[in-house]
Amino acid sequence: MNRTAFLTLTLLLLGVISYAQDKIPAMADVPAGHFWMGSSGWGYDYDEAPVHKVNITNGFRMSISEITNAQYEEFRPEHRQLRGKDGFSYGDDEAVVHVSYDDACAYCEWLSETTGRHFRLPTEAEWEYACRAGTYTLYWIGDGLPESMQKHQRTERDMVPVSLQTCSSPANGFGLHDMHGNVEEWCIDWYGPYNAEEQTDPAGPSEGIYRVTRGGSHNTPHEFLRTANRSAAMPSDRHSQIGFRVVESNYRPDYTGQVAAAPGNVRMKKAKWASTGDKPVWTAPVPYIHTPDDGTPFYKHNHQPAVTWCDNGDLLAIWFSCDAESGREMVVLSSRLSKGSRQWSKPSLFFKVPDRNLTGSSLLHLPDGRLMHMNGVSNAGDWKNLAMSVRFSEDNGRTWCAPEFAAAEHTVRHQVIAGPIITQDGRIIQCCDAGPGSHDGSAVHISSDWGRSWIDPWDGSGQPDFKEGGNGSTIAGIHVGLVELSDGSLMTLGRGNSIVGKDGRKQMPKSISTDGGKTWTYSASGFPAIDGGQRLVLMKLQEGPLMLVSFTDHPQRTPENERGMDFTHGKGYGMFVALSYDDGMTWPVRRLMTDGVERMLDGGAWTKQFIMDSTHAEPRGYLAGTQTPDGMIHILSSRLHYQFNLAWITEVPSGL
């Protein structure tokens, strides 16, 4: 090789090396050591306990801030199209967002291949060790977060845009910036429980559902930015509050955590159903929500149920539990009524994406015996910006596959409502509130492949004028019930967007679609409007008629002279059931939901205590319903379980 060629090759190699090194983010050294991980785990923070000793035997280098737009776009230039989405992260040096766990791992692999060095995401233990930098205060900087380090630290329905400029906060003792806030950061671990034993280089369980995120974000209350706080997300989630930083280390983490055990005591034998026949059957309401005694997270507000039946004869009920409906402490709990039992089980944890609001749940029994669960998943708190998740069970709800997104964008039209249906041609139709307000209307999401993919047939137009004879692409009312009529058209009844009827009073709106949910025509339903703390059930019974369960009025908001409805033996108040034999044109059968026995009941949630007697039924509650193969109809309110059959509805009540 001549001198010129040698020099040329040398310069080329130096250029390649220089190019590769330029890709490496600014890094800080984090030495080996040990620390005490977690917190006392009081209240919402139960998953931070127990405090346990962790040894970090391998020092590592960590990027001094989150990976920026400019750095990430060296790997994926097309990501530039997402700059500024939702009002965040416009600049080169702002933290990259709208990246999934897999996106973050792919960047680490690319950076490793490009530089010939070893990059990955931090383990959860490495992240907390690096954040603490030898401290044990709530934040590395102390027990409070200075104003200069805050980026609108509160929950907002409409997030307030802030800069995500990296290195905008002081560095901790290891030289790391932005460890509290800016954006959450993906960690390599599956989310799982802590244990009290001393651990060395832990890396979480070998399998799981959610990946850990740490550090908190903008538009997030202070407590979620604490050093010990644990959050997590579905690995495929992407939104404006999660980014990542990288670690350089030759150490490859090995799984060390616990894998959650599947619940037991669920029978697998298929039940035999005997018809209840023509004899009226009514069972006095019993609670399906009890206080757990095994440490299951349980809060003061238990609400918004869904229910279905299982092939083994059990009923499965779910609902959310929280202190605030906009809260990030929200969990979805379940209880089970085993076939032949009158006592519902104590609640157990059914669904929880840590530190995410989970408003909106539904359950559905599929023809092949599987169960389908759909749920809203917020990017943070509140119930406006929800994605929709879906998962399935093949063993009567004992275990469930990992959830996937039915609709991945965190936006409106995704607040799942109980009561999905299966149409005559095999489509699943799931109703959702179209917005967070009481008069935002409703949407439908449709699957033609048994839940694997979903579409919203909405044309993108604004909210229509919900008036008699009007039409639009959004359903009138929220919390709607949906049925398919005999000609294949769809009908809903809902709450809010009331339409004045011929009697001059506000009535529950009815919406009809003859084109598979693309457009809807509105009219007054003939039934009283309902309001806060109330949700109806609309079902097509196995025997053929349509069934509505709703309320005669709102006990606080309906004008007194408009309260109550006329029934066979006079005026009644509260929950009632009605039947239609002509696709909702007329409703000749109406019965107050009571057996006439006076009793004091606790309806939970917004209902609280009420008297049931011959003229009064439950005054309000969020209803959900299912009909089992034996013909029994099961209605859940916010706390109580009612069961009866068609013969009871049509029976002429005596003494009422």
Question: What do these predicted regions represent?
Answer:
Residues 22-83, 102, 181:
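A short glycine-rich, aromatic-capped structural motif
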Residues 201-205, 231-238, 565-567, 613-614, ...:
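Short proline/glycine-enriched turn/loop segments at secondary-structure junctions
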Residues 240-253:
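Short, structured beta-strand segments at or near domain termini in extracellular proteins/domains
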